[in-house]
């Protein structure tokens, strides 16, 4: 009982450090967006990187993911969820980008016109 009250009576350094790091990451993202001459895509990748770092920081510092007895299971489940979300998003972007021009035809004919040319002689 005395150990539990000693744990809760100390100053929340972990929360203060997490808060300061969150502010620093936000200001870094703002600096990259406003004050650098990088391309838009480079800025986006850097800002998304800062966002993922900040999300992990908030989960670890404020959500107390590793402090329970099954903390490693919670971290593993969260990482698996992030992996699934990243695979779905990047896979969707890859499919959209790779097959964007699949239906486009330079000759002006609608898609599927060349495949159905054997039926063109059956006009009524």
Curated annotation (Swiss-Prot):
Membrane topology annotation: Multi-pass membrane protein
Primary residence: membrane
Residues passing through the membrane, by range: 16-36, 44-64, 78-98
The protein's name: Quinol oxidase subunit 4
InterPro entries, A to Z: Cyt_c_oxidase_su4_prok, Cytochrome_c_oxidase_bac_sub4, QoxD
Source organism phylogeny: Bacteria, Bacillati, Bacillota, Bacilli, Bacillales
Keywords: Cell membrane, Membrane, Oxidoreductase, Transmembrane, Transmembrane helix
Enzymatic reactions: 2 a quinol + O2 = 2 a quinone + 2 H2O
GO biological process, one term: electron transport coupled proton transport
Single GO cellular component term: cytochrome o ubiquinol oxidase complex
A Pfam family: COX4_pro
GO terms assigned for molecular function: cytochrome bo3 ubiquinol oxidase activity; oxidoreductase activity, acting on diphenols and related substances as donors, oxygen as acceptor; proton transmembrane transporter activity
Gene: qoxD
